[in-house]
């Protein structure tokens, strides 16, 4: 049953945010989306985010410019002098970490939530097999507290904004299974950190995506071999 409320989803164009978008369509009355241009090497993901939000039929899709992240040095996603590794994720934070990225993104999404009086903000983080610090439950609860403490809407209406994270505690394969049940068009999603068409198939996010499909007995649509 749908909740009689609204939500704004952080949509990157990748697998997890697509699954969250389709789940939100099922669970909420009004669904908005926001994507971010932050100087990422894989900026092509925004084209896929647009296609996904159009197919999902969201109320509105915002593209937020985040220029200050474009100057972040040391992250392979934004620093042109740092190569995207051809390896799986390490145990600790990888070189593809953009410091405070999700905190920046949630803050921007919260601004839209305040303006449009949206009660929920959705982010498709899954902490079990993610090496990123800002995909953990501790981060989500702290971000939610900060959003509510600074929200004009909350101050006026006395209701809370919830950071909706239904995939927290799941693996990427778990999220994929949910997306398949919901009918997510995975052929319209994109996950490669190198920003190539077709995806490189070698970077950590490509590898994790390919492995998730293998785990459910399927081939990634991007790498499906002709029979």
UniProtKB/Swiss-Prot annotation:
Residues binding Zn(2+): 192, 200, 203, 206
Keyword annotations: ATP-binding, Ligase, Metal-binding, Nucleotide-binding, Queuosine biosynthesis, Zinc
GO molecular function, one term: zinc ion binding
Pathway participation: Purine metabolism; 7-cyano-7-deazaguanine biosynthesis
Binding-site positions, ATP: 11-21
Keyword Metal-binding: yes
Family: Belongs to the QueC family.
Protein name: 7-cyano-7-deazaguanine synthase
The organism of origin for this protein: Persephonella marina (strain DSM 14350 / EX-H1)
């Amino acid at each position: 049953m749908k909740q009689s409320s609204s939500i704004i989803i952080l949509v990157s164009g990748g697998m997890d945010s697509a699954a969250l978008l389709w789940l939100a369509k099922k669970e909420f009355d009004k669904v908005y989306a926001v994507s971010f241009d932050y100087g990422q090497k894989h900026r092509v993901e925004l084209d896929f985010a647009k296609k996904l939000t159009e197919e999902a039929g969201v109320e509105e899709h915002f593209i937020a410019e985040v220029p200050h992240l474009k100057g972040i040095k040391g992250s392979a996603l934004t620093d042109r002098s740092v190569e995207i590794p051809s390896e799986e994720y390490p145990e600790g934070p990888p070189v593809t970490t953009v410091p405070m990225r999700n905190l920046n993104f949630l803050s921007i999404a919260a601004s839209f939530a305040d303006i449009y009086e949206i009660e929920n903000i959705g982010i498709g983080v899954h902490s079990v097999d993610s090496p990123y610090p800002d995909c953990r439950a501790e981060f989500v609860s702290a971000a939610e507290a900060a959003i509510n403490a600074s929200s004009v809407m909350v101050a006026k209406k006395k209701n809370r904004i919830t950071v909706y994270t239904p995939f927290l505690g799941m693996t990427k394969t778990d999220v994929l299974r949910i997306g398949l049940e919901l009918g997510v068009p995975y052929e319209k999603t994109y996950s490669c950190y190198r920003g190539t068409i077709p995806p490189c198939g070698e970077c950590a996010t490509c590898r994790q995506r390919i492995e998730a499909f293998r785990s459910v007995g399927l081939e990634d649509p991007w790498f499906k071999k002709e029979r």
